[in-house]
Amino acid sequence: SPSQDFMRF
């Protein structure tokens, strides 16, 4: 989800 896109590390 876009809201969790920052978690894609």
From Swiss-Prot:
Its main location: secreted. Transmembrane segments: none annotated. It comes from the Eukaryota. Belongs to the FARP (FMRFamide related peptide) family. GO terms for biological process: neuropeptide signaling pathway. Able to induce fluid secretion from the isolated salivary gland of Calliphora. It comes from Calliphora vomitoria. Keywords: Amidation, Neuropeptide, Secreted. The modification Phenylalanine amide is found at F9. The keyword Phosphoprotein does not apply. One of its GO terms (cellular component) is extracellular region. It is found in: Secreted. This is CalliFMRFamide-3. The keyword Kinase does not apply.
